[in-house]
């Protein structure tokens, strides 16, 4: 196999994600033969640094020996098992370890397939909870301007990046948006904390007026990644947690990108000293292995 041959085979059978395939008529695909640590190697022996961590996923390096050996050992014992009516030791051990690391107040783990599915589960669980409480008018969600929460229809409904959602607008449910506390939008001389407090007024007003129909607020804590790494002050999360408690609304923390120490604390929510009602994880949870 060589680079050119694999590129030909690829273009004959694959559509790549987040890609205009016509671009690859002029811009070659990078074919990779193997990887180790941060290095990717093509079929001609040229090496590349995986600086995007394969889309923010690979936190332990490619072909990590410890992980490789653990997976090989597990494959000889049990490769997969339905969790409806069954259990196994690895899933219980993982759940125990995750809960020990998570903000205090989170008590159960639920597993889905990927990040978008994690968001879908959180949205559904929130609505289901309120309906079980007799609060059947609660069917709406709130997200921030510039938010990104995934590519499936429910996740796209709480996403505010037209590049991803505009084409499918007629399929999406209508949700509430409030201005982001992204500090790059702050006037000169305004501190990140002051701007976050100012921007929170719109959220407070919406929750005060519409909380009878709102299930949850969903946010990317501290950093809105797909919007361009837009950052905001932790005080916004503190104010949001208090307001969600005040108005009877869930708080969903989408830490799919920022979880697992990417912001300096193990979870970004820890910098605000809050516990969300739902904590959505993916990416670094499996480091791309599973």
Regions inferred by a protein language model and the residue ranges of each:
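Conserved N-terminal phosphate-binding loop of PLP-dependent enzymes in the Aspartate aminotransferase
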Residues: 1-290
């Amino acid at each position: 196999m060589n680079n050119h041959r694999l590129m030909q085979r690829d273009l004959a059978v694959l559509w790549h994600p987040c890609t205009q395939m016509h671009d690859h008529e002029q811009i070659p695909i990078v074919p990779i033969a193997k990887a180790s640590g941060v290095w990717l190697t093509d079929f001609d022996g040229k090496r590349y640094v995986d600086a995007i961590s394969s889309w923010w996923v690979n936190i332990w390096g490619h072909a990590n020996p410890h992980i490789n050996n653990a997976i090989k050992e597990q494959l000889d014992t049990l490769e997969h098992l339905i969790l409806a009516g069954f259990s196994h030791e690895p899933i219980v051990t993982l759940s125990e370890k995750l809960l020990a690391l998570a903000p205090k107040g989170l008590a159960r783990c639920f597993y889905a397939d990927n990040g978008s599915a994690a968001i879908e589960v959180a949205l559904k669980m929130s609505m289901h909870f309120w309906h079980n409480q007799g609060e059947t008018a609660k069917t709406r969600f709130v997200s921030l301007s510039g938010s990104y929460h995934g590519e499936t229809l429910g996740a796209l409904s709480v996403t505010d990046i037209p590049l991803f959602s505009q084409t499918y607008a007629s399929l999406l449910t209508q949700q509430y948006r409030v201005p982001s506390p992204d500090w790059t939008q702050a006037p000169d001389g305004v501190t990140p904390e002051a701007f976050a407090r100012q921007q929170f007024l719109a959220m407070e007003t919406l929750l005060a007026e519409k909380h009878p129909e709102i299930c949850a607020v969903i946010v990317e804590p501290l950093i809105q990644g797909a919007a361009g790494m837009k950052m905001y002050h932790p005080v916004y999360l503190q104010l949001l947690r208090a307001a969600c408690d005040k108005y009877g609304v869930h708080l969903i923390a989408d830490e799919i990108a920022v979880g697992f120490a990417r912001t300096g604390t193990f979870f970004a929510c820890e910098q605000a000293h809050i516990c969300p009602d739902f904590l959505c994880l993916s990416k670094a949870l499996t480091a791309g292995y599973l």
